[in-house]
Design a protein with these regions (language model features):
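N-terminal loops that bind phosphate or other acidic moieties
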Residues: 1-121
Length: 121
């Protein structure tokens, strides 16, 4: 069964939006959102052009993983707004957010999944 890339990206985007709404969190607040949003933005921006082309889809996934990694790394310069780290927000500057690492790993895992784990075209 073929995966509808545009629908999959839409579902991922909706999921991240739901997370932001439920957690009352936005990018720049030193959370998993700081990795997820850049990855989803790359996917949203390239899904239509890559759809149906396995090579272009793989490249798009790699680009999304790179964007998520950059978003995660950017949390080092942010002050924590949520969770226990927010109690000593100034001390959180210079420390990588653990949640953002999870977001980075999600995108890295998707991008590095062997092609044979995906449906045949």
């Amino acid at each position: 069964q073929e995966v509808d890339v545009i629908a999959a990206v839409g579902a991922l985007d909706a999921g991240v939006q739901n997370m932001m709404d439920k957690a009352e969190s936005r990018p720049g607040e030193k959370t998993i959102i700081d990795a997820l949003v850049p990855g989803v933005e790359v996917l949203r921006g390239g899904a239509a052009r890559a759809a149906g082309n396995a090579e272009a889809e793989r490249a798009l996934l790699r680009d999304a993983a790179a964007a998520a990694a950059a978003g995660s790394e950017a949390t080092r310069q942010m002050e924590a707004v949520h969770g226990r780290a927010a109690y000593s927000a100034e001390r959180s500057i210079g420390v990588l957010d653990g949640g953002s690492v999870v977001g980075r790993l999600i995108f890295a895992g998707i991008a590095s999944a062997p092609a044979e784990t995906r449906p045949e075209r």
